[in-house]
Regions:
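Active-site-adjacent alpha/beta core region of enzyme catalytic domains
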Residues: 83-137
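Patatin-like phospholipase
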Residues: 2-6, 11-102
């Protein structure tokens, strides 16, 4: 049996909800059956953090429960990115129209989310959905 996950946006609340879903899958021994993940917004941030906490590999059930989930919780609860992004935005107005770049830079510095998508394991397949602000498409 293969499992496909469609994880929605909604910022950090969505990310935390998705962590609960993944915890349930890990507790049931199902992480290895996840074959495709589709994410948008907060879910994409959540997945990036999960991969960053596991050397760009999809975690096994044990890895997720014992190492990845605690590391992700620590990042979310102890390494605030919103405050640092806002502070940097006001100290460096250059980023005013480049907020996505600013968020990426802060996530790299505070949460160690870095690297290239090509470095991520190919299984499960990960589809990152987005909308262009300029066109709405």
């Amino acid at each position: 049996m293969h499992i496909g996950l469609a994880l929605s946006g909604g910022g950090m609340r969505a990310a935390i909800y998705h962590l609960g879903v993944l915890r349930y899958l890990a507790q049931q021994g199902l992480m290895g059956r996840v074959s495709h993940i589709s994410t948008v917004s907060g879910a994409s941030i959540c997945m990036g953090l999960i991969y960053a906490c596991n050397a760009n590999q999809w975690p096994s059930d044990t890895q997720f429960l014992e190492r990845v989930l605690p590391a992700v919780k620590k990042c979310i609860t102890q390494k605030d990115i919103q405050w640092h992004a806002l502070l940097r935005l006001f100290l460096q107005p250059y980023y005013w129209d480049k907020k996505v770049n600013l968020l990426a830079k802060v996530m790299e510095q505070r949460w160690a989310v870095k690297g290239c998508l090509q470095d991520i394991a190919s299984c499960p397949a990960w589809t990152i959905n987005t909308t262009a602000y300029e066109s709405g498409k």
